[in-house]
Amino acid sequence: MKKILLVRPPRFLWPFINESDNFLLPLGLPCIAGQIRSKLPDIEIKIIDCPPLKIGWESLGKIIREENPDMVGAGEEALYCHEAVRLFNLAKEINPAVITVAGGHFFSWMVDHSLNDFPIDFIVRFEGEETIVELIKAINEKKNLVEVKGIAYKNNGQIIRTPPRPLIKDLDTLALPAFDLMPMGKYSPFGYLWPQSVTLEHSRGCIDRCNFCSLWTFWGQHLKTDIEKGELDVTPRYRTKSVERMLEEIDIVYKKYNRKYIIWADPTFNVDDKWTNDFCDGLLKRNYKDLHWWAFLRADYLLRDEKAGILEKMVLAGLTHPLIGVERGCTEDLRKVQKSVYTRDLVKEVFLILKNKYPQVFRQGTFITCLPFDTRESMLDLVKYAVEIDIDYPAFHPVAPVPGTFLYQEALKNNALEEKDFRKYDWATPIMRSDNGFSMEEFAKLNMELNKRYILYRPHWIFRGLFSPYKHKRGLYWWFLQNTLKMMFLGVMDVVLGKKKFEGITGFMRLKKPGWYDS
């Protein structure tokens, strides 16, 4: 094996953000490529990131023919797993001898389904840097594949799962991501949400056990992983790179690639207060101009950080868009989804601090909706909660129990999945069957009503943001207004022009096919 092609295939667009903001840098690809290049320098490796380059399926086929790789790899989440499958089919049509390797959140869990139904030769399960290097070595040296930990494959029709690979203890030992193989200038060049963005991570894993989240289970300690047989046993694990290593990565993307907006992929950015403090000190010493960042933060830790003076440093160092997982408004609901319990008073205090002391930041909270036990009253209470804590943007997301979450296992057991097409697991479409008689369309209308009540019934909210004295916050409010109007207009025009039939509220939220998709 001499040449490897890693691909993010073409895909549909989120309708409620512009195309430039749709495609953030897929960090897994340069991480895998960097490790292969570091350990196996004789291997030629290329990355084809189709969406930001507007490479459609016809063009991708030409590229694969021209490159003639020995191995094609892709990793996907449930929402886009069908695009990876199409890639593997295309690669095998062009060259039946090509080795296809799948990874990422979906394929790591859905082993039997993937190997039995799709043209996949190997699955690299979960954390992939060490596994892919060892797999390539084993193939090239014709070693016994069963000795490679963390893979799944077929041998004479039988599916083989090798033992889980131990987690990488020291993330600093990993090679730097191969940003030079990515089209760095193409990520959000005209973005409203994340202009000149780059995706980075300083940690892997989480300390919480939310039953709707696949991030902590993916990066956790895997004890039982055969979810297709109902087996799931994972222990949360949290690891972080050193401050020095993280500052080195930021130096590269800022100085070499002029990336000014960091999207932190960490499930929880502010777990370790000492790390955060030292990191912000290092970043402030660099005095980078116009550097901003977006991060998932825990509310209780944010309160801790404020009392220690760390939150102030975070804002000075570039924190512009804190996103807090509020999720639900009552203790009973939080316990049902196995999330750490925040009291309403604690969450309100945190958002009040952000509003009064750091008015330049855009305060966002996420709320999960359309759970089986939801009633009209329980969902409308989330709007009251959002008003109570006075945030800039409440994201009301219908829950999508993807493979690898404990909620998915529970839903399978209770036959609670109303929608089984993973192409609709987009956190905008209701998925789970209601215990209280709601149809999926009724759930969708109710979820839309939450947005209407927060936005349309409170016009001062939108006007306050549109004329904010802070450029970044003002831009986000204009983005919100423009894209809401655009989404509604395009949805109506599709129906008027006969491009599709009216699908109700859910139809406005579906992913849209870009013009370059087939080209």
Language-model features, listed with the residues they occupy:
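Glycine-rich beta-alpha loop elements in corrinoid/cobalamin-binding modules
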Residues: 35-39, 44-170, 397-404
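Catalytic cores of alpha/beta
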Residues: 113-116, 372-388
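Radical SAM enzyme core and accessory elements
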Residues: 3-6, 18, 41-44, 61, ...
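Radical SAM [4Fe-4S] cluster-binding motif and immediate context
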Residues: 177-362, 384
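N-terminal [4Fe-4S]-dependent radical SAM core
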Residues: 10-13, 148, 154-202, 226
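Short beta-strand/loop segments at the ligand-binding rim of alpha/beta enzyme cores
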Residues: 93-102, 290-292, 360-364
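Conserved strand-turn element in the central/C-terminal portion of the radical SAM core barrel
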Residues: 52, 296-302, 325-338, 351-378, ...
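Short catalytic helix/loop segments, enriched in acidic residues and glycine
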Residues: 22-36
